[in-house]
Design a protein with these regions (language model features):
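A conserved regulatory-domain signal marking ACT and ACT-like small-molecule sensing domains
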Residues: 2-97
Length: 97
């Protein structure tokens, strides 16, 4: 688990919605366009529900975190899924067991 501050450039992207063609392609294409590197990716489909979590490095990103959040949110609307982007430290703190 990340220690405070050391992973400030790491983000977690979550994607949830009905499974359909093009979700992975759309999300990864947008991240590449933003110059965001994917460090880890996990994807499952359960009973027609698509779920994907990506750990990414945005150290060399073209835009700010807010811009990436807005762009990915718009992409999610286009794809018919919920896409959320948050700092890794916040994600880990919210999902601590």
């Amino acid at each position: 688990m990340p220690k405070g501050g050391q992973d400030i450039k790491k983000i977690v992207v979550t994607v949830i919605g009905a499974d359909r063609v093009g979700i992975v392609a759309g999300v990864t294409k947008e991240l590449a366009k933003e110059n965001i590197n994917i460090l880890d990716i996990s994807q499952t489909i359960l009973d027609g529900i698509f779920d994907m979590v990506l750990i990414c490095d945005m150290e060399n990103a073209k835009g700010s975190l807010k811009q990436v959040q807005d762009d990915m949110g718009e992409l999610g609307r286009e794809l018919g899924v919920d896409v959320r982007v948050q700092l890794a430290d916040i994600f880990y703190a919210m999902h601590r067991i």
